Amino acid sequence: MKFTITRINKQNKLMVSSKTVERFLERIAKDDAKLSVTNFRMSVPLMEADYQYYKGIKEWQHVYPAAEFNKDESGNLVFQKSNGLVMLHFINLMSDQEKDAVKKTVSLLPMTFAAFEGADGRSLIVLVSICNEEGKIPTKEADADLLYQSAYEQVKTL
């Protein structure tokens, strides 16, 4: 299984790469040489939960755990393969106790694939495994889209 990672470079061009789940988890376990996450977390208390204006945020990488994508000749993302993962993002967890409580709860669920702290230090990202009624991950984009919509409807009230 691979995650798709995108970013916009300084020439405003979409860059696309894929990383195995193992490589991705190794990579997020430590900060980069510019201490991007550390500096961001220091700035978070000064912001009002609106991170879009944080310096350099547009150059940050964006991760798509739900599916693998490639880029076509026009620079658009094109679906390749579904990973059968839904991302749940729990926000505004202000204390370690709140984060630990959510981590403990999701660790007890058999469908939890992974859970990790968000870049802001105040959120938890949980990847949940999903499949269709036959226990399979859809191979076609339209089928995957329907499965993701169904899964979203089931968990949006959490």
Language model: regions and residue ranges:
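DNA replication initiation on ssDNA origins
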Residues: 1-84
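Hydrophobic, Leu/Ile/Phe/Ala-enriched alpha-helical segments that form helix-helix packing faces
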Residues: 47, 51, 106-110, 155-158
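Catalytic micro-motifs at enzyme active sites that drive phosphoryl/nucleotidyl and oxygen chemistry
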Residues: 72-78, 102-119
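A broad structural signal for short, well-ordered beta-strand segments within beta-sheet-rich domains
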Residues: 80-83, 93-94, 112-114
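Helical (often loop-to-helix) elements that flank the catalytic cores of nucleotide-handling enzymes
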Residues: 102-105, 130-158
